[in-house]
Amino acid sequence: MTSHRLPEITLTPELTAAAAEAKAWPFEEARKILKRYAKTGLPETVIFETGYGPSGLPHIGTFGEVARTSMVRHAFRILTQDKVKTRLICFSDDLDGMRKVPDNVPDRAALEPYLQMPLSSVPNPFGGDYKSFAEHNNAMLCRFLDTFGFDYEFASATEYYRSGRFDTVLLKAVERYDDIMKVMLPTLGEERQATYSPFLPISPKSGRVLYVPMKKVDAKAGTITFDDEDGEETTLSVTGGKVKLQWKPDFGMRWAALGVDFEMFGKDHQTNAGIYDRICEILGGRAPEHFVYELFLDQLGQKISKSKGNGISIDEWLAYAPTESLTLYNFQKPKTAKKLYFDVIPKTVDEYFTYLSAYARQEWKDRLNNPVWHIHYGNPPKADLPVTFALMLNLVSASNAESPAVLWGFISRHVPGVTPENNPELDALVGYAIRYFNDFVKPTKKFRAPDDVERAALEALDAKLGELPAGTDGNVIQNAILDVARAIERYQDHTKKSPEGGPGVSVSFFQMLYEVLIGQERGPRFGSFVALYGIDETRALIKKALAGELA
């Protein structure tokens, strides 16, 4: 178990009333558990579980499962007024055989001899003090979860099987072998049906996890008989970690053995959920409540895989954004497939701070639907962010700032009184913005020269900005920019109306400004950018573009 404690809960009549009506998905899921025990009354302890396959390093999907489950757990605590104990078990399937050598490990050839051996018996290729591949990856999972302060209990399949904690249920699986086969065989092809067994013996000679047919299953003795790899008939007890279950029966067995009440899993498990449930019931358990989430996709729209190492890692996200933004991305639309790559970070950061600033002004019923209530377990901090992350990225781009001090020069002029000391959240974002810009924006920046119409527009904009005093508000600057665009036929949008009743302004005008002046296709509100960067500085940028010094 980790040293982290569950977040403190302060129950008030307002919170209790709002929770009863809350529509946010963690509350909807928590109500399933209440309904589960509506007739019998709630047990002393409710068990939440998440699973982890340590075939590769943990990725954000792994983290997200724990984060989301923790949100449901917290909502459940509120709905039950914290009168029911809860546990969150993070279970690692580290007795599974290594089916292939992962792509993202050093010296792949050195692991080839260990194919089909339990992951906890495969040597650790990463170096350090960890004895096995699984022990290393399990430690990485716990490190990630500890970083975020989750309260959880880590459980290892290897330890549970070998210590005998699953023995009672495994002996029941031998007794009910025929019932399990009746569930499994219809799900298999004809060829596989002939050799399938829910039991996977671990060869006493080679140490490999064997996919072999059973010659005998002895319910009375609690043993299975099979031919080992060398052809010798072998009998093993199903207890003590000598035998494990195939992954589908294993899922249901674990639920029965641990008494799991709630588990979420990815859409790739959805078609098998009924199988897991039935196996759990055959083994004397009650199937838990489920929540099926959509899978994250990489930049190419492919499913993120632990063994491929595609997508983005937890550490990579945290190099460019605060931890809360990552938790927000996991909270949002869990039933929608979302791309998980570096380009989603700036928008997510700004959304987090937008939700955070709104929280204090909201009534309780709206607070419980605000993601920050769930991210911070009902106690979000106060934070005022006078400059958005997207705006900061444009400021770095225009100013070529390489140090936080340069950016703070612009920020403190724009927002007097704000300093790194009195706004540490903003100071952290300054560092993130510089790093993100250098790694992702700068390499793709591409300025273009303006055509004749665009040159005239830029000259008119320069003149208009020259009429405004230093320190002019961003909204006033934005309106001045719009006035320039409305007078140019190319940028008139007749589907929109200006305040005076004339045509509105096409987004192509702002796209032109960003392409010519910043070297990017889009950006935040241009008036806000000018207010932050400075009117004189923006006019100097326009002059550079007109002189051909940017493209």
Swiss-Prot record:
Quote one Gene Ontology molecular function term.
tRNA binding
Pfam families on file: tRNA-synt_1f (PF01921)
Q: Where is motif 'HIGH' region found? A: 54-62
Q: Where is this motif: 'KMSKS' region?
A: 303-307
- What EC designation does it have? 6.1.1.6
Compartments annotated for it: namely: Cytoplasm
Alphabetized InterPro entries for the sequence: aa-tRNA-synth_I_codon-bd_sub2 (IPR020751), aa-tRNA-synth_I_CS (IPR001412), aa_tRNA-synth_I_cd-bd_sf (IPR008925), Lys-tRNA-ligase (IPR002904), Rossmann-like_a/b/a_fold (IPR014729)
Tell me yes or no: is Transmembrane among this UniProt entry's keywords: no
Keywords for the protein's UniProt record, in alphabetical order: Aminoacyl-tRNA synthetase, ATP-binding, Cytoplasm, Ligase, Nucleotide-binding, Protein biosynthesis
The record's annotation in PANTHER family points to: LYSINE--TRNA LIGASE
Which NCBIfam families has this protein been placed in? Answer: lysS_arch, PRK00750.1-2
In Swiss-Prot or TrEMBL terms, this protein is called Lysine--tRNA ligase
Gene that encodes it: lysS
